[in-house]
Amino acid sequence: MSVLVTGGAGYLGSQLVLALRDEGENVVVLDNLSTGYEWAVPRGAELVIGDVGDRLLLNHLMRTRRVDAVLHLAGALVVVDSVADPLGYYLNHSIKTRELIAAAVANGVEHIVLSSSTAIYGHPAENPVPETAPLEPLTPYAVFKASAERMLAEAGASYGLKSVSLRTGHIAGADPSGRVGHAIVGATDLVKIVLEAALGRREYVPVFGTDYDTPDGTGIRDYVHVADAADAHLAALAHLRAGGDSLTVNCGYGQGHSVLEVIDAVQRIAGKVLDVRARARRADDIVSLVADPHRILKTLAWQPRFSNLETILEHALAWEARAAMRAA
């Protein structure tokens, strides 16, 4: 039997495929390489370059590779792109996810793990936010994640498909052994930007919003190490294979860090003072979003290994430094 990983050549995907291979799993990666890289797919995993919405290809892979589970990570991570072209985003993500789920049902695939996002909560009324909180997706990216969760729930009710949706916080860090890391061109996430500035690849670090109702006036997020996020997907797969029911769980540490806290930590680790420039708030930016981890810790026995912010940033900085040397 094999595991099909969509988006397995990307940031989280490549880390997950490494973890699956370390567990001895047969892995098929389906990726169009729009934000992924062939070199990021580890030895022993099969890379198929193709589209997650290609029904004929999906049918072929699921039958010939004897796929028993799908880990669905495909999807662009740059949220501003989803805002710039929402209809195109829905076509490339929501509609194609429907094709993936339909192919799984048609070919007898019993388990799907969805990489969802805490972004679907929007502006939560409480932090840490539990899974029972109302959903308020504010961007096409978040709408896509919420709709994918809904499609899986309905497929479960109608066809018996079992699934786990992992609402993950802001993924950061890199493989602790330095095998893979964040390599997406044009990425806009805070950690990537701050580390590039620390390595002299950016002139300054913009801070969008310094007047929020938080201790230092900047936004707060739950940063999750990419290796811990990969482990959560493995735990979700093990849960389903053991006959567990469908679940929706947060994947986070229950502790948030502000923008300025991240910048200060990078300055300490890198030993540099960065040029930090205040900017106006961006539309629909969330003030504070921290995931309540109680359900995932209880139901999936997930045991995060790298929850310390400085550890996350040290691994990420080591990766970025090596990437800069390779590019020189």
Which role does the model predict for each range below?
Residues 191, 199-328:
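C-terminal substrate-binding subdomain of Rossmann-fold SDR/epimerase-dehydratase oxidoreductases
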Residues 13-14, 79, 97, 148, ...:
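Alpha-helical structural signal
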Residues 176-179, 218-219:
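Short acidic, glycine/proline-rich loop/turn micro-motifs
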Residues 90, 138-146, 180-192, 222-223:
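Short-chain dehydrogenase/reductase
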Residues 1-174:
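N-terminal Rossmann-like NAD(P)+-binding domain of SDR-like oxidoreductases, especially those catalyzing
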Residues 50, 183-187, 255, 305:
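Residue-level signature of the cytosolic catalytic core of signaling kinases
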